[in-house]
């Protein structure tokens, strides 16, 4: 793991990482707090999983009109929001023919903003050749198809928020990385580099913000969701020697970052979606153990 910081100057509150309602929630700078509450028609890809469980309700709360496209069934979406709040289109966005449907073309023509988080989860399965291919295609082919269709529109959306990952920087644990650093040269770094390059072919009139997302934490899933049962059983501890950096972000912060990015036309380019102060794995494990009243002694190889 590597140490990632962001050059974006947002202030955070100090709070418990286990509680999304009081986690280190981004304070929107004063220049943003006075913005009018612009209601937009948004098209979302890849938002029916761990991040989407909080992102979609937060966008609905802001008053945005949502069209969500996903390979998942509509039943999966019902666990996130009510049917009446969302226009749902089931399709595989990595297949170019899926974009020919009248329903998705109409949604594209009317959308004012796009949030592209599509991608097979990286940490859920072993990295077999087949899974690495799925990780790659679900991101690159989806984004290629999205960009191609956006460029064909007579009226371009105002903004495209495209996911990337801190894996962009490779795996040098001795270096502190900011948005200005060059990419690494391993599988994830090359994937993120190509993913971002495709997104940059967006329509000229569309503002692009690429969010290089860190390790996303929330108690109902992701890395923290896997760690909590182990720690609660008294079997928790750091991974490896505990000296590796953990550049994390709470899911609530990430959703706030995306919401703020929609509103603020001054935000473009690349931002590291991480908390301002990365921690060593030892420190994170010790803090988690203290919060739960459990030991953090058993290192995971």
Regions inferred by a protein language model and the residue ranges of each:
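N-terminal Rossmann-fold cofactor-binding loop
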Residues: 69-74
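NAD(P)-dependent short-chain dehydrogenase/reductase
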Residues: 189, 193, 203, 207-210, ...
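Catalytic helix-loop patch of NAD(P)-dependent Rossmann-fold dehydrogenases
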Residues: 137, 141, 171-210
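Alpha-helical substrate-binding/gating segment
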Residues: 228-236, 244-278
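Mid/C-terminal beta-alpha module of Rossmann-like enzyme folds, strongest
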Residues: 261-301
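Conserved Rossmann-fold NAD(P)-dependent oxidoreductase catalytic core, especially the SDR/UDP-sugar
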Residues: 132-134, 144-186
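N-terminal Rossmann NAD(P)H-binding glycine-rich loop of SDR-like oxidoreductase domains
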Residues: 42-62
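NAD(P)H-binding glycine-rich loop region in Rossmannoid oxidoreductase-like domains
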Residues: 87-142
């Amino acid at each position: 793991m590597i140490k990632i910081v962001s050059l974006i100057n947002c202030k955070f509150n100090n709070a418990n990482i286990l509680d999304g309602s009081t986690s280190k929630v981004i304070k929107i700078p004063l220049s943003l707090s006075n913005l009018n509450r612009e209601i937009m028609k948004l098209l979302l890809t890849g938002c029916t999983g761990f991040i989407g469980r909080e992102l979609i309700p937060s966008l609905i709360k802001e008053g945005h009109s949502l069209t969500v496209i996903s390979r998942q069934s509509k039943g999966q979406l019902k666990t996130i929001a009510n049917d009446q709040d969302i226009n749902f289109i089931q399709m595989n966005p990595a297949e170019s023919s899926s974009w020919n449907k009248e329903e998705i073309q109409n949604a594209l023509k009317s959308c004012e903003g796009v949030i592209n988080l599509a991608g097979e989860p990286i940490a859920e399965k072993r990295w077999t050749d087949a899974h690495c291919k799925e990780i790659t295609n679900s991101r690159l082919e989806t984004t290629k198809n999205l960009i191609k269709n956006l460029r064909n529109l007579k009226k371009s959306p105002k903004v495209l928020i495209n996911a990337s990952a801190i894996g962009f920087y490779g795996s040098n644990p001795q270096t502190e990385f900011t948005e200005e650093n060059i990419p690494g040269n391993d599988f994830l770094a090359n994937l993120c580099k190509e993913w971002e390059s495709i997104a940059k072919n967006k329509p000229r009139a569309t503002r692009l913000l690429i969010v290089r997302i860190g390790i996303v934490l929330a108690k109902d899933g992701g890395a923290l969701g896997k760690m909590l049962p182990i720690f609660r059983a008294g079997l928790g501890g750091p991974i490896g020697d505990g000296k590796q950096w953990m550049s994390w972000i709470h899911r609530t912060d990430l959703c706030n970052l995306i919401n703020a990015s929609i509103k603020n036309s001054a935000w473009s380019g690349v931002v590291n979606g991480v908390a301002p102060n990365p921690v060593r794995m030892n420190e994170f494990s010790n803090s988690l153990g203290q919060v739960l009243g459990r030991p953090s002694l058993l290192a995971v190889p």
